[in-house]
Amino acid sequence: MNGALIPHTPIAVDFWSLRRAGSARLFFLSHMHSDHTVGLSSTWARPLYCSPITAYLVHRHLQVPKEWIRALEVGESHVLPLDEIGRETMTVTLMDANHCPGSVMFLFEGYFGTILYTGDFRYTPSMLKEPALKLGKQIHTLYLDNTNCNPAWVLPSRQEAARQIVELIRKHPQHNIKIGLYSLGKESLLEQLALEFQTWVVLSPRRLELVQLLGLADVFTLEEKAGRIHAVDHMEICHSAMLHWNQTHPTIAILPTSRKIHRSHPDIHIIPYSDHSSYSELRTFVAALKPCQVVPIVSRQPCRDYFQDSLSPRLSVPLIPDSVQQYMNSSSRKPSFLWLLLERRLKRPRTRGVVFDSSQETADQSQADRDSKKAKNENLSGDLEKQASRHPLQNKKQLFPDFCSKEWDGTAPSSESQKMVTVRTAPLSFSVHVRSTDENFLSLETGEETGVGPHLVPRGDHDGLAATGNQSACLGQDSPLSHRSKAAPLQAPEFRGLALKYLLTPVNFFQAQFSSRGFDQQVEKYHKP
């Protein structure tokens, strides 16, 4: 990743690892090449500053949300705050980097002095005529693209490299031309070749969309056979591809790059056409600016020693204003918006278990309404007790109409899947699906969450069913509802109090440990005073 955190400032350029960003709060993107966007994705949720073309591309191809993208016009100066109270500001000016569509250099001016960040750039003399640079400003720190910073590498200008490509194509008038490119860059070279040879240049849909955005000449097409010049991905240029292309039509391939690449086929031609400044161009650029220090952007390629004779005296480390320091440290103490949203979501009460259809109580409900509701419940419990005392078997059929369509044969009622039991209560009309023993349900009386464990005991009442054994919800297990159960039968006083309190009659009241012959006797015994 070719990016940097600028010390003693909240500025980060081409740096997208928030975990390692430290106190960086202002993030800038110089251009859209992949080695400068590592870590940048659709999940990015911080303000991002870039050129208008890069703003379009970063949303179109990386799906960065528009709400976080801040497009800054090239050639203009923009004032940005450096704290949360507006006391400290900085000025940032974007200048064309002559590297690829949308690429820019950033000139930062503030309490830290003047910092020029070139990003990837190809030097031209016109850069020194930029209004932001020609006023003789002292550059305190120069972040320099040092990709080709090696005296042993001699590179031609792009005009000279383009001329070499034209001459090579002229030597192969009957050949198709495959030009290997990266996903972004050298579109102007393709336009130049199309106009020179009066032919269409065949592009991929993605690159065609880009050249239309740039407003280049109408010399590009998607039709494979419309022209003899084809722009392809540089990874497609290989030995096997050359064999395949030459089987159908004579073809040569051109790789316009300054990188050292092994030629795997005699028809692959490498032309040193580079979008990075040569060593001699870097020397000219640094000598004209005379910065106080040079910081290489490509850390694996040191270059400081090459410019010692072009540097101005270094300045002391700038003091960070208190308001800026607080701004840089604020996010380390303050939770992010996403964290707060998650916290709020977790704190929001969620409906779980059984939901009852009833009118919602409002905060201003009168005490008279509460008393009326309480009296109604007491009358309901009394009616249930009277019905149970007069017609126990009839009451059994009312409580379990699905199970009593025919005479009970002593086996446990179950669904077709043998996994779930449906329990109906009277006089309420809803059904409760008893789930596995590690789930929770809501208490019928309090609405609180109550665990359904091995003993079906409501919270706050441990006397009713504590001695009755296990009531398994999954009938495929060794359930007390089967004849193999060793659990003791329910005691009448215990169950009667529980039934009146919770309006719930468990199935094992009628089935646990009862034979078909002794069922009526057990019912009569239960209702004796």
UniProtKB/Swiss-Prot annotation:
<keyword id="KW-0227">DNA damage</keyword>
<feature type="cross-link" description="Glycyl lysine isopeptide (Lys-Gly) (interchain with G-Cter in SUMO2)">
    <location>
        <position position="334"/>
    </location>
</feature>
<dbReference type="GO" id="GO:0006303">
    <property type="term" value="P:double-strand break repair via nonhomologous end joining"/>
</dbReference>
<protein>
    <recommendedName>
        <fullName>5' exonuclease Apollo</fullName>
        <ecNumber>3.1.-.-</ecNumber>
        <ecNumber>3.5.2.6</ecNumber>
    </recommendedName>
</protein>
<comment type="similarity">
    <text>Belongs to the DNA repair metallo-beta-lactamase (DRMBL) family.</text>
</comment>
<comment type="subunit">
    <text>Interacts with TERF2; the interaction is direct. Interacts with MUS81, MRE11 and FANCD2. Interacts with HSPA2, HSPA8 and HSPA14. Interacts with SPAG5.</text>
</comment>
<keyword id="KW-0963">Cytoplasm</keyword>
<dbReference type="GO" id="GO:0005634">
    <property type="term" value="C:nucleus"/>
</dbReference>
<dbReference type="Pfam" id="PF07522">
    <property type="entry name" value="DRMBL"/>
</dbReference>
<keyword id="KW-0378">Hydrolase</keyword>
<keyword id="KW-1017">Isopeptide bond</keyword>
<keyword id="KW-0540">Nuclease</keyword>
<dbReference type="GO" id="GO:0000781">
    <property type="term" value="C:chromosome, telomeric region"/>
</dbReference>
<dbReference type="GO" id="GO:0005813">
    <property type="term" value="C:centrosome"/>
</dbReference>
<dbReference type="InterPro" id="IPR036866">
    <property type="entry name" value="RibonucZ/Hydroxyglut_hydro"/>
</dbReference>
<feature type="region of interest" description="Disordered">
    <location>
        <begin position="461"/>
        <end position="487"/>
    </location>
</feature>
<keyword id="KW-0234">DNA repair</keyword>
<keyword id="KW-0832">Ubl conjugation</keyword>
<keyword id="KW-0539">Nucleus</keyword>
<keyword id="KW-0206">Cytoskeleton</keyword>
<dbReference type="GO" id="GO:0036297">
    <property type="term" value="P:interstrand cross-link repair"/>
</dbReference>
<feature type="compositionally biased region" description="Polar residues">
    <location>
        <begin position="357"/>
        <end position="366"/>
    </location>
</feature>
<dbReference type="GO" id="GO:0008409">
    <property type="term" value="F:5'-3' exonuclease activity"/>
</dbReference>
<dbReference type="GO" id="GO:0005737">
    <property type="term" value="C:cytoplasm"/>
</dbReference>
<keyword id="KW-0779">Telomere</keyword>
<feature type="compositionally biased region" description="Polar residues">
    <location>
        <begin position="468"/>
        <end position="482"/>
    </location>
</feature>
<dbReference type="InterPro" id="IPR001279">
    <property type="entry name" value="Metallo-B-lactamas"/>
</dbReference>
<feature type="compositionally biased region" description="Basic and acidic residues">
    <location>
        <begin position="367"/>
        <end position="388"/>
    </location>
</feature>
<dbReference type="GO" id="GO:0000723">
    <property type="term" value="P:telomere maintenance"/>
</dbReference>
<dbReference type="GO" id="GO:0003684">
    <property type="term" value="F:damaged DNA binding"/>
</dbReference>
<dbReference type="GO" id="GO:0031848">
    <property type="term" value="P:protection from non-homologous end joining at telomere"/>
</dbReference>
<keyword id="KW-0269">Exonuclease</keyword>
<comment type="function">
    <text>5'-3' exonuclease that plays a central role in telomere maintenance and protection during S-phase. Participates in the protection of telomeres against non-homologous end-joining (NHEJ)-mediated repair, thereby ensuring that telomeres do not fuse.</text>
</comment>
<feature type="short sequence motif" description="TBM">
    <location>
        <begin position="494"/>
        <end position="509"/>
    </location>
</feature>
<dbReference type="GO" id="GO:0035312">
    <property type="term" value="F:5'-3' DNA exonuclease activity"/>
</dbReference>
<dbReference type="GO" id="GO:0031860">
    <property type="term" value="P:telomeric 3' overhang formation"/>
</dbReference>
<dbReference type="InterPro" id="IPR011084">
    <property type="entry name" value="DRMBL"/>
</dbReference>
<dbReference type="GO" id="GO:0031627">
    <property type="term" value="P:telomeric loop formation"/>
</dbReference>
<feature type="region of interest" description="Disordered">
    <location>
        <begin position="352"/>
        <end position="396"/>
    </location>
</feature>
<keyword id="KW-0158">Chromosome</keyword>
<dbReference type="GO" id="GO:0008800">
    <property type="term" value="F:beta-lactamase activity"/>
</dbReference>
